[in-house]
């Protein structure tokens, strides 16, 4: 797998005049990876007689001639690439491990590539995938280069785990982050919190899940608590910071919360994810305040440390491991030819609120519903 250097410009491999695996893929409806395995006579994978026929017939009709046998490839087994922004946040490391467990059950190998949310890194790895022998790709976040992802998906099966997005024409495992934000807001309003702070790392459309969560919180407060307010505090995190600072999410939560503690009307904090929420918790404690007696704190994701004592974190369950396993199952069905490449699968996981000890009614107030 060759990844070009920063100063190299690449695009997906252009069509050639001879009949290619891609030509047969278009005719048969199966991925180039599936076509390649059938036409090369791979013995470590099996396909139904009908699938083999649907690949061999267009190959013969088009006059496909295989190239000379290549030297052994690093990816002679079915190898899947996992693309993620980082592996420090347990949300991503849990997804990665779940994919690897599911892949091992199918005798597949995995590679992991971290982008640190850098669009150039994403483009480089996608172009490298287009010219590789990889069997499939799983994105653990919404890609920034959606058009390129769709083009690569014509060559290599791609599955994306991320925010609900009906405009992305690849297989997806989704969560409705707008609804997740609304659930937390409704709960906080019910506790009696009229003025809350939303604490986040970079807020932009490249990080759509964060924005959708905020929109869900804001809209719910506007509709259910018009006398209340959502105070937004965010800080941009560069790809270099995400790569070099292993505690950047905690640091952002800590820094922004300390700036909010002087605002007397704020009684609760909603963090964009659980890692940021830990920074919020530590900032409150550093100022000699208590959770939930003085401030309530919520997060999103339900990463595994969120249940730990002394204060369990109220958060939204995102079924992290289940999403990883499901994404690989969808990918494997494309890799093995069990599912047609012409079909797009969308799976949406329903979330729910997990209430723990980090939230309570504001001091002196009773829960309203």
What function would you assign to each model-found segment?
Residues 1-30:
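Extreme N-terminal segment that seeds HTH/winged-HTH DNA-binding domains in transcriptional regulators
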Residues 103-114, 218-250:
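Short beta-strand elements in bilobed, periplasmic/extracellular small-molecule ligand-binding domains
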